[in-house]
A protein has these predicted regions:
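Single conserved hydrophobic/aromatic residue that forms the stacking wall/gate
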Residues: 1-7, 11, 435-443
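Helix-loop-helix
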Residues: 58-59, 70-84, 88, 159-434, ...
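Soluble non-transmembrane domains of integral membrane proteins
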Residues: 5-8, 12-198
């Protein structure tokens, strides 16, 4: 192993000669060569495409009378870990797919412990939020990968089987290097055209991969139609509402009935306040009689959660969303609303600290949540009612730092929900007002 490393250092640290063309372009590759003391010639033919791909074809010409073994290898070095915010939904660090298994190692993990794996196929690299540098070893060659830290972060591979080159024999090996911005179409194109196993996972789609990726393609489709990602987000919100319209319709009808039944429920609670068991029985009888599901009102919230996180993920990790403007003051949908209610949205010449940046769109979102809440039945428990009343303000503060595109999605979704809910309540109220609610049996 030591002798092998010495040979590697000998090859790597030599001065190479450029043969012929000395300018690397997509139409003109370059050739580097070097001959060692044993009369073995090493040639590197380096070519690039018109985007991010480098191909390094390494040829060894053995002009000696002996047989030698060589171990092709490649290495990516990062001197320092970047300054990153520790988001739980995004991986930045060392990455690879080995025999179809994704491996993600954070910088701090590698500082503490080396990672090694043997594989028959795959790729390895170092990734940031929007950028990746990756190595793709030659196909059908087994290799070992090491992620380690020795004053520098290193992602490297070395073939585990020697390439034997006899006297007067020539052999070649090709390594692909991709130094890319993580644009979805480009990454997918390399994965398909170069047959790179699961290279699309270079973009951190996350746990909701099955939902996030199709959602991105749909948003991107609407963007190509409208020319604005903000409008695309609004259209995707409408599509989601349409898909789940029947389920939301059922839920809102049940909530509307609950609101109409609220006086009767209050009366029952007052009547049976000393007998919890009897109260429960009477309540269940009332629900059964009027065909009301008391928990169905939670369905719209549960429906929103996966799509909320999926859109957040799309906004957060896809390069296509970066620096995409909406209308007015929103210049980047992947960033928070830059305005603040505490300086009257820019009318007062004062820059509030970041935790006070509660902008126009978060305020609109909070207002839409408050108005939607007014359409729901009031909780009979006073403490619960106060908590619910405080909830829109709480979420406004919590979601204010989130990407403005996500806040726009939430606001439009609330408005559409209110419209649907309002119509259903109006229709259901008239219908239920004709229902006679029988008196409960008194004890």
């Amino acid at each position: 192993t030591t002798a092998r490393r010495q040979r590697q250092m000998c090859i790597r640290d030599r001065i190479w000669t450029i043969e012929g063309n000395n300018k690397l372009t997509p139409n003109s590759p370059i050739k580097l060569s070097w001959t060692n003391d044993q009369n073995i010639k090493f040639i590197k033919d380096i070519s690039i495409d018109d985007q991010y791909l480098f191909k390094v074809n390494q040829t060894i010409i053995n002009n000696s009378e002996k047989t030698y073994n060589f171990y092709p290898y490649g290495q990516i070095i990062r001197n320092l870990a970047p300054e990153i915010i520790d988001f739980f939904i995004l991986h930045e660090g060392l990455i690879g797919v080995f025999d179809d298994q994704l491996v993600e190692e954070d910088y701090d993990d590698i500082e503490e412990k080396k990672f090694s794996i043997n594989a028959d196929k795959g790729w390895l690299g170092i990734t940031d939020k929007y950028w990746i540098t990756s190595l793709i070893p030659q196909e059908n060659r087994k290799f070992r990968t090491d992620f380690d830290y020795k004053n520098k972060f290193r992602a490297n591979f070395i073939e585990t089987s020697a390439t034997e080159i006899g006297a007067n024999e020539t052999k070649s090996n090709e390594i692909k290097i991709i130094i890319a911005a993580k644009e979805v179409d480009i990454i997918a194109g390399y994965a398909e055209n170069l047959n790179i196993s699961k290279y699309d996972l270079a973009i951190d789609w996350g746990w909701f991969y099955f939902l996030v990726k199709p959602l991105f393609f749909l948003i991107d489709y609407f963007f190509k139609l409208t020319g604005n990602f903000g409008i695309a987000i609004i259209l995707i919100t409408i599509c989601i509402r349409i898909v789940f319209f029947p389920l939301a319709n059922y839920s809102f009808k049940s909530m509307a009935k609950m609101k109409v039944l609220q006086p009767e429920m209050t009366r029952l609670k007052e009547l049976h306040k000393e007998d919890k068991m009897k109260l429960q029985q009477e309540m269940m009888a009332l629900y059964k009689k009027e065909k009301v599901n008391p928990v169905s009102g939670c369905l719209p919230i549960f429906i929103q959660i996966p799509f909320f996180f999926a859109i957040y993920k799309v906004l957060f990790v896809t390069l296509e969303m970066r620096h995409q403007p909406f209308y007015g003051w929103i210049k980047d949908l992947s960033e928070r609303d830059p305005t603040s209610i505490f300086n009257l949205f820019g009318l007062i010449p004062w820059d509030p600290p970041s935790f006070l940046l509660i902008g126009v769109w978060p305020c609109l979102m909070g207002l839409s949540m408050y108005l939607q809440q007014k359409l729901n039945p009031t909780p009979p428990d006073p403490i619960q009612a106060k908590i619910f009343a405080f909830f829109p303000l709480f979420l406004t503060v919590i979601l204010a730092p989130f990407p403005s595109g996500l806040v726009i999605y939430w606001t439009i979704n609330d408005i559409l929900t209110m419209a649907q809910q309002y119509v259903i309540i109006k229709r259901t109220t008239v219908k239920l007002s004709l229902i006679h609610i029988s008196e409960p049996t008194r004890l």
